[in-house]
Amino acid sequence: MKVRVFTFFKIFSIIIIEDEKLKRIGNLWDKIISYDNLYLAYKKAREGRGHLESVKRFEQNIEGNLKQLQQSLINKTFSTSRYNTRIIYEPKKRVIYILPFFPDRILQHALMNIIAPIFHARFIKDTYACIPERGLHAGLVRANSYTQKNDYCLKMDVKKFYPSIHHETLYKIIERKIKDENVLWLINNIIHSFEGDRNCPIGNLTSQWFGNIYLTQLDYFIKQKLRAKYYIRYCDDFLIFSNDKMWLNQCREEITQFLDNVLKLKMSKCDLFPVSRGVDFLGYRYFKGYVLLRKRTARGIIRRLRKLYSEYDKGRIKPDKMLSHLSSVDGYISWANSYNFRQKIDLNNRISEVRKCLKIYRSIVISAQTIT
C-alpha cells in the first residue's frame, strides 16, 4: 500500500483534517462570565484545596471576589498571573507550573465548563488521557484488544510535548472552531501567559485540554488520511497496529512529516516491532493471551508500599486510609496476570491484616463516642 505524500505541507502553516462543513461556534462569552458559571468554577477549583490560605482568603468574601473576577473579564483587565514552578520526578523529571492566584484557577474552570464539551465532541474514541469518562483502564483494555488482533505495532512518542506546543499553531486550531472574539481574547491570554512562542504549562487545567485539542489534528490525520484502523493515543504516546509491517513503516514517515510541518513537533521515540515482543503501554506489557506489569511499574509499586507500610507502622496513616491505598494497588495489578507479583508483595495478607485492624479501630471509636 502506497501512502500519498501530502504536498500541501509546504503551502499551509496549519490544517484541520476534520469535516470542513462544521460551523464555528459563537455566543459563548456571556455563558462563561455568568455568575452561576463562575460559582460552579469556584466549587471545582477548590476541590482538594480548601486548606490553602489563598482559598481561605478568597472564601472570606466569595460573592464579592467572584463579581470582581467577573468585572475584570467584562473590562478585559484580567491577566494570567506569573507562574511558580516545582520539579517532580514521576518517573522522569518534569517542571510543574503553579498559578498562585486562586481566581486564575477559577477562570480556567469557567472557560472549560463551556468550551470543553465543544472539543470533547470532536475527540476520536481512541484517545484517553484527561478526558471525562475515559481513562487509563479504558485505554489499556483497547491496547490489549488491538494486540490480540495484529502482528506488528508502531509505537511513537512526541519529544517534550507540552513544552513544545507552538502558541500560534494552537491558537489557530482553536480559532477554527471558536468564533467568539471575547472568548478568543481570553484563550489567547492564557496561551501567551508563558513567555516565548512555545510551552503549554503542565499543571494548568487548560493545558490538559489544549494538549488533546492540539493532537486531535494528528488523530484525524492518522484515522482519515492514513486510514489506520487500530490506533490509540494516551497524551503524547500513541500506537498503531497492523499485520502489514511495510505499511506501518510508511505511516512512520508520514506521521513524522506531519508533526514536523503542521504541528511543529519532533518525535522522541519511534519503534516498529512484532507484538510477540510485548507492547509496552500505560504501565503494562501486552502479549497475545496475557498481560504483565512493566518492571518499572512493579518496582514503583514496591517502593510505594514500603513507604506506606513504614508510615502505617508508625501510626501516621489510619487503617481506613491504608486500606484505601492497598485496594488501589490491588485494583491496578488486577488488570495484569500478577499472581507471582501479588505473592511477592504479600498483598492479600496485608489487606486482610489491615481490615482486622480497621474493625478494631472502628469499635474503639464507637465506644469512645458512646462514653462521651
Residues of each region from the PLM?
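Non-catalytic, polymerase-adjacent accessory regions of viral genome-replication enzymes
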Residues: M1-K67, S367-T372
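Active-site-proximal segment of RNA-dependent polymerases
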Residues: V3-D19, R24-L28, M112-H166
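Non-catalytic, well-ordered alpha-helical scaffold segments
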Residues: G26, D36-Y39, E63, K67, ...
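Short coil/turn segments at secondary-structure boundaries
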Residues: A41-K44, S54-F58, T80-I87, F123-Y128, ...
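Short, conserved non-catalytic motifs in the polymerase core
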Residues: G48-R57, S81-Q108, R122-R134, I190-N212
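Active-site-flanking structural segment that lines cofactor/substrate pockets
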Residues: I62-K93
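Conserved polymerase palm-domain catalytic core
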Residues: N65, S72-L73, P91, K125-D126, ...
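Right-hand nucleic-acid polymerase module
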Residues: H109, N249, M267-T372
